[in-house]
Regions:
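PDZ/PDZ-like domain micro-motif
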Residues: 204, 296-310, 329
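His/Asp/Glu-rich mid-to-C-terminal helical/loop segments that flank catalytic regions of hydrolases
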Residues: 98, 105, 109, 220-266
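Terminal peptide-recognition signature
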Residues: 63, 100, 119, 279, ...
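Acidic/histidine-enriched alpha-helical segments
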Residues: 114-122, 149-152, 251-271
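PDZ-domain C-terminal substructure recognizer with occasional recognition of PDZ-binding tails
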Residues: 313, 328-356
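Soluble metallo-hydrolase cores and metallopeptidase-like ectodomains found primarily
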Residues: 2-89, 102-105, 109-114, 137
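Conserved PDZ fold ligand-binding element
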Residues: 303-323
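Metal-dependent peptidase/peptidase-like ectodomains
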Residues: 2-3, 9-27, 56-58, 112, ...
């Protein structure tokens, strides 16, 4: 169980309309606003669900997926604009939860005895990895007996045209890379060595457990009510699970991996920024710039005319070569300013005016 408690930090969120109502010279000045707000705390109870498959082995493999999602978006995180709608979260993360159940059924029928299996369905992931963070602080088995943690988060949107699967955490054990590459089968694997990331494997990595996170990529329906079951690639999910099974079978006979700390490429030298453009980047894109996989309605990008499939090449005076330079450019933007956004669209360079 995890009971969330409120902090003593006051938080204020301003809508674009609220910002527009402020004096134009307010930002950058030393003026102060007096605010009167009423705060109502809501306590919720969330539960992790665990199943232990005891094979009488000294070490245990953890397979995990988070089963929570956004509900009606009342706790934040939704990219939907308009009347509240239920967010079913088919890809994020019913796909991973279904994969967890399928693997539990599969291994229950096998005679694998090198290690035990612990199947974990986490809650509270969308609110900040709460379920997995709680588990590693209150584990039901010694963490030093864990072989590795495999995390399935958004495995339901494999593209048939590329069959590209993201595997994160490949730098957390010396043994990972040869296995990840050689066992790919029909899949094209895009690796990320970092053990950190915005999913539950991070909680285990921070406890010196080797991890792998399986991820088929972002899409326009991410954190929207349209993330529904009819948009999942079920044959693709099967390919992902078969790949995970091959990896499990290839684990060392003694059930020990050489854990390694990794460079946190996601957070290293990341600039702080106050603004958002309102795009969903294509994290599998390997070319110049930042490819747009989705555009959030009502945000600056959408209002400027940015389209899904565009590739961002420049923002104001900044050149955008990759995600790092994009974030640097975003950090250099100012509220209320209008700048030129350069995108590549269907082979041509298009200049748009975006206002923050």
């Amino acid at each position: 169980d995890r009971r969330t408690r409120s902090s003593s930090i006051p938080v204020l969120s301003l809508t674009p309309e609220g910002v527009a109502a402020l004096p134009t010279d307010f930002f950058g000045s030393e003026d102060r606003l007096r605010l009167e707000v009423s705060v109502q705390a809501h306590q919720v109870v969330a539960r992790n669900v665990a199943a232990f498959m005891d094979r009488g082995a000294p070490r245990t493999l953890v397979l995990g997926a988070h089963y929570d999602h956004l509900g009606y978006g009342e706790y934040g995180g939704s990219r939907h604009r308009g009347e509240p709608q239920i967010h079913n979260g088919a890809d994020d993360n019913a796909s991973g939860t279904a994969g967890l159940l399928a693997l539990a059924r599969y291994w229950a029928q096998q005679d694998e005895s090198r290690f035990n299996f612990l199947f974990l369905a986490f809650s509270g992931e969308e609110m900040g990895l709460l379920g997995s963070a709680y588990f590693v602080r209150h584990p039901v088995i010694p963490l030093d007996s864990v072989v590795a943690m495999f995390n399935m988060d958004m495995i339901g949107r494999l593209q048939d045209s590329t069959r590209q699967l993201g595997v994160h955490g490949t730098g957390t054990a010396l043994e990972w890379m040869p296995m990840v590459d050689s066992l790919a089968g029909p899949l094209r694997i895009k690796v990320s060595p970092a053990g950190t990331g915005s999913s539950d494997h991070q909680s285990f990595y921070l406890q010196n457990v080797p991890v792998l996170h399986f991820f088929t990529g972002t899409h326009e329906d991410y954190h929207k009510p349209s993330d529904d079951a009819d948009r999942l690639n079920y044959q693709g999910m099967q390919l992902v699970l078969e790949y995970i099974i091959r990896l499990v079978r290839a684990l060392p006979q003694q059930g020990r991996l050489s854990f390694r700390k990794t460079q946190n490429t996601e957070n290293q030298a990341t600039p702080r920024f106050r603004l958002t453009l309102g795009i969903m980047p294509d994290y599998f894109y390997e070319g110049e710039g930042v490819k747009v996989d989705g555009v959030t309605e009502g945000k600056p990008a959408a209002l400027a005319g940015v389209r899904q499939g565009d590739t961002l090449l420049g923002l104001g005076d900044f050149v955008v070569r990759d995600m790092q330079t994009y974030m640097t450019a975003l950090a250099g933007m100012e509220i209320g300013k209008t700048v030129t956004l350069r995108v590549q669209r269907n082979g041509s360079i298009v200049e748009l005016q975006v206002r923050f």
